[in-house]
Each structure stands twice: as structure tokens, then as C-alpha cells.
Amino acid sequence: MADLLWQKPGVAVDAQIQTFLAGDDVILDREFFLHDIAASAAHAQGLQHIGILSADELAGLLRELEILAQDFREGRFVLDTQYEDGHSAIEARLTERLGDAGRKIHTGRSRNDQILVATRLWLKEKLLSVAQLSADVAKVALDRAQAEKDLPIPGYTHIQRAVVSSAGMWWAGWAEAFIDNAIRARDTHALVDANPLGTAAGYGVNLPLDREHTTAALGFARMQISPIYAQLSRGKFELAALEALGGATLDLRRIAWDLSLFTSAEFGFVALPAQYTTGSSIMPNKRNPDVIELMRATHASVAAARTEIEQLLSLPSGYHRDLQSSKGAIFHGFGRGLAALELLPALLANLEWRDDKLRAAIDSGMYATDVAVEAAVAGVPFREAYKAAAAGADSAGQGRTPEGSLAARVSPGSAADLRLDELRARWQALS
């Protein structure tokens, strides 16, 4: 491992202890590395503004940071275990190429605010992905709700047949859910859109750092003013981001559950495209919906990441090395969550309803609620109407059709009044 930034003269470093301390930090830092480089460039500009760096030194640093970013993207620079972490790698590279200018770049900066700002930039990027993917899912659902608004399907409660429903209602439900998920991701993006760079180790420094410049240069909406709060927000903001992602993966889990049921032979309501299924290694007849099953499992990874960070945050104020473990949690949670969400729009766009199976699953008893409500409208107290409809549930469907039941469902949001224009207006407001 290269020289450690914090190593004191005459003090030996125990290799086993150092390996434990570093953990997989340098590997995880590959996710942050380009953001760390961008923040280093903004910090260098700020140092030049207050006279720590000359114009020539700044020009050299900016040039070498750009070269480093390009080398990293193209595989010529590998962030590996010869470095303690990504921050050390940047400083080592700049020092190797530029000498004293490289040694100056850490002036007024701690690895504490360095990882904070890189993480914050990464979270902003991922939250925008959650928002966009949620909007994409909502768009597919809205389009299919419009196209299939009159297609009858059975509605379930307790996984038991309940009332006549429609594909339009089913799709509209997911459309509104994912519109809300997009809104939540954007709201969380606004929360984390605060620049912690310049708070150093959590107590500021005796330099007039140009934090307004770094805030603008890095595209933050505002400065995170308090150095104490900058450290308190580490983990807190990651947790908020995972909660926003979790809203989307929670709905993903439930839609995957619906599709797991609907594609089974016992239901047979939906046919999945072949590319979303796999076979069995021993049973030649099998066509397994592995994609939706793994989608269903995704929320567990997001929830586990959230739980890990919640437990890490049992800490007093100030920086603590425990927080290093938050990196792996957010990478795993967002890695699994976004990968699943990326597949969802195309899956939903290409699934096919089986009309004959849907209609066959609508039985006479599913009209009993219609019978009770109609009697109540005619003046029968609802509880009496309910009892009469329950007694005659087996014959409630006589003379009735699924289409007639849906046409009568006029309460706002129901089959005859889906309010798709209102939902589409909310979706359009996302852009």
C-alpha cells in the first residue's frame, strides 16, 4: 500500500490492522471516484481564489484531474489496493505528476468532507434515475390504462374473488403509485442537494474557503452551512435516499407478486414474453417467471441496506469510522434496486392479457356488491340491502355482464371514471 496520508514519522503501520481498517474501501470508492475528482477540481479552484494556489498550479491540477478522470474511465488508471482509498489515490497521482501543487490540494479539506461531497453527488445522480424510471413505469401504465380501460378482470381482496374490476383500474393504480414514487425521489433529491465540501473534519478550518464557488461549480442548490450538521447528515441522507428508492421497489414487489399469481397455471390471466422466463435444469416442461421473482426479491436488498445504515447511526455527533460501512449498503441497495426498475417498463409494455381466462374467473357472486348498492339507492337501508345480497350472492350475476358492472362504477377513480387525464397531467408535471 502506498504511503498513508495520516502516517506519523517513526510509527510503524501494522499490515493486518491496516487491511482491516481499509476493508473494501478502495474497491467501493470506484463508484465515487469520478465525483471525487470533480469535487477536487472545484476545491482547487476555491483554493486559488483565496491565494493558496497560483494560477499556474491550478491550471496544472485541473489538467491532471481531467487526465486522471479519462484514464480511469478508459481503464488506464486502476483504483486498487495499493491505495488506502480513492482520496489517497487522487492526491498520490497529483503529487507524482505535479509535486508540491499536488501536496497542496488537501489544504482546508478533510477526507470527511471529501467523502461527504462525493457521496452527495452520487446520491443526486441515483435519485434522478429513480425518478426517471418511476416516470417511465407510470407512462407505460397510463398508456395501457387508456387502451385497456374496458377490459374486465377479476378484482381480489384477501386473494379471493371480490368484485368485477378492469385492466384500466389495475393499470391506473400502478400509474399513480409510480407518479408518487417519482415525486418522492425528486423531493429527496432536493433534500440531499446541499454542498458539504468545505466543512473539513466537521468543525471548519481557519481559512476563508470559497464555499459559494464550490456549491455553484458542483451544481448544488445550496450550501450545507453547519460543519456539525454536515457530519450528522452522513447516513441520514443516505437513509432518506434508500427510503425513496424503497418506495419504488416496494411497489415493484407488489406488482411482481400480482404477475407471479396472474402468470401461474392456476390463474392464467397473463402471458409473459419468453425472454422474461427461464427453464428448469431437470423438468423440461417448466417455464419459470424468474425475472419477476427476482424483481419481487429486490426490495429485500433495499430494506437490508436501510436497516444497516439505521443501525450504523447509533452514534454521537462528529465523524466516526463506523460510517465507512454505509458505502457498501447504498451501493448494494441502489445497484439491485435500479437494475430491477430498469427492466420494469419494457416488461409491463409487453405482457399480454388472456381475455378468456379473465372472463372465466368472473363469477356470479362478484356482482353482489352491485346488487346491494343498487338496493340502497332505491331506498333500502344499506345494512338490510347487504344482508339480502349476501343471501342471494350465488345468483347475483343473473342478467348482468362485466361491462355493465364496470359502466355503473362511476365513483371518481373507478372503472367508469378513471380520471386518466388528471393522472396524465400529474405525470407531465414531472418533466
Swiss-Prot record:
One of its GO terms (cellular component) is cytosol. GO terms for molecular function: argininosuccinate lyase activity. Keywords: Amino-acid biosynthesis, Arginine biosynthesis, Cytoplasm, Lyase. SUPFAM superfamilies: L-aspartase-like (SSF48557). Transmembrane segments: none annotated. It comes from the Bacteria. Pfam families: Lyase_1. It is found in: Cytoplasm. Pathway: Amino-acid biosynthesis; L-arginine biosynthesis; L-arginine from L-ornithine and carbamoyl phosphate: step 3/3. InterPro entries: Argininosuccinate_lyase (IPR009049), Fumarase/histidase_N (IPR024083), Fumarate_lyase_CS (IPR020557), Fumarate_lyase_fam (IPR000362), Fumarate_lyase_N (IPR022761), L-Aspartase-like (IPR008948). GO terms for biological process: arginine biosynthetic process via ornithine; L-arginine biosynthetic process. Its EC number is 4.3.2.1. It catalyses: 2-(N(omega)-L-arginino)succinate = fumarate + L-arginine. PANTHER family: ARGININOSUCCINATE LYASE (PTHR43814:SF1). Belongs to the lyase 1 family. Argininosuccinate lyase subfamily. HAMAP family: Arg_succ_lyase. This is Argininosuccinate lyase.
